[in-house]
């Protein structure tokens, strides 16, 4: 294992935060006028067009959005070195390295770990005893619920950003893991032949992290990102933090050449449908998770535009302006999911 602190990542986030009033100030200043939120939502929808991945993102970030119950998919290796196991609602992503497994998220409970993660990894030829790290992308129970079970059974180390370790300690939810390793902004974790870079992307929670890592498809190398927390927070100030994270992470993606988009909630980005497309072979020799660098950047631009709309919805509600269609003003996001 080697940890390397990126000198640029924290600076990138701070610069993005500092520039936010300049980049978006004029737009946000006028966002309190009637219909401004709807303009953002309509713009995002136009950018998404008929792209099923982007359209699903628009839906997931729209005011009042809810994740429906769906049947859990069968486990699948979506890349040569990446496996996904899922409850349908939430997924765990296993990075298969020459030195063992880095598991991003651990589903919702010890039972999920015992009855889903362990047997389903085995069904894909992955030995769960080789899980070396469990990374909680953020401090909600649907992401860390099985972490302590894996730590107890296999000696896996559990990683989370300090802000969300504190969140977990304050909330004291069921199945919370014991505090173990902190994730620093820009930190690199190397296991075997794979290095993962973690970026702080606060907003969904104070300590949400989004990793960037190499993947292989039929021997060809690509670069993936996994957005750590999708559901926008309730408070307007936290939505602004989310927006700053989107801007900073977009720059990091561009710098890294990200051409693969992943999410821990597959209904937020058409990920479950893409799993079935890949499983059924309807994508031919291609991989539907390889969306290309320009489309990955457009994905983030859609996210940015939707967040500007959500901020505008809050402002319209606070000034007595009629909220955009489908909005109830400051939307009460589900506090412990997504």
Where are these regions (language model features)?
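Conserved beta-strand hairpin/beta-sheet module of binuclear metal-dependent hydrolase folds
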Residues: 69-124, 210-231
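Metallo-beta-lactamase
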Residues: 101, 108-110, 178, 188-190, ...
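N-terminal secretory signal peptides
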Residues: 1-8, 12-23
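Zn-dependent metallo-beta-lactamase
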Residues: 31-100, 110, 338
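Sec/Tat signal peptide C-region and signal peptidase I cleavage site
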Residues: 25-30
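Active-site HxH/HxHxD metal-binding segment of metal-dependent hydrolases
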Residues: 34-46, 111-115, 121-188, 291, ...
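Structural recognition of the beta-strand scaffold that forms the well-ordered cores
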Residues: 84, 96, 102-104, 132-136, ...
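C-terminal regulatory/interaction regions
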Residues: 32-36, 44, 296-338
């Amino acid at each position: 294992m080697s940890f390397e602190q990126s000198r640029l990542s924290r600076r990138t986030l701070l610069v993005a935060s500092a520039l936010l009033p300049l980049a978006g100030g004029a737009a946000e200043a006028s966002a309190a006028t009637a219909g401004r939120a709807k303009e953002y939502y309509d713009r995002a929808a136009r950018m998404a067009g008929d792209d099923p991945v982007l359209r699903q993102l628009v839906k997931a970030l729209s005011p009042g959005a809810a994740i429906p119950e769906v049947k859990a998919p069968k486990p699948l290796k979506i890349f040569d070195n990446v496996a996904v196991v899922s409850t349908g609602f939430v997924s765990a992503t296993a990075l298969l390295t020459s030195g063992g497994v880095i598991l991003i998220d651990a589903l919702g409970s010890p039972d999920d770990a015992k009855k889903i993660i362990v047997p389903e990894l085995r069904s894909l030829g992955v030995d769960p005893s080789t899980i070396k790290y469990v990374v909680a992308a953020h401090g909600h129970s649907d992401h860390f619920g099985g972490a302590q079970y894996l730590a107890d059974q296999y000696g896996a180390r559990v990683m989370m950003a300090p802000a969300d370790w504190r969140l977990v300690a304050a909330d004291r939810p069921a199945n919370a893991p014991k505090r173990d390793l902190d994730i620093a902004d820009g930190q690199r974790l190397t296991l075997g032949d794979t290095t993962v870079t973690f970026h702080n992307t606060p907003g969904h929670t104070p300590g949400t992290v989004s990793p960037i890592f190499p993947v292989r498809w039929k021997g060809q190398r690509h670069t993936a990102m996994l957005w750590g927390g999708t559901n926008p927070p309730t408070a307007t100030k936290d939505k602004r933090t989310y927006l700053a994270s989107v801007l900073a992470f977009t720059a990091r993606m561009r710098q890294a050449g990200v051409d693969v988009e992943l999410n821990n909630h597959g209904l937020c980005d058409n990920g479950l449908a893409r799993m079935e497309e890949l499983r059924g072979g309807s994508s031919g020799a291609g991989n539907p998770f390889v969306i290309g660098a320009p489309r990955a950047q457009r994905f983030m631009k859609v996210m940015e535009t939707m967040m500007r709309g959500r901020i505008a919805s809050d402002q319209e509600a606070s000034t007595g302006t009629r909220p955009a269609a489908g909005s109830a003003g400051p939307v009460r996001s589900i506090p412990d999911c997504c």
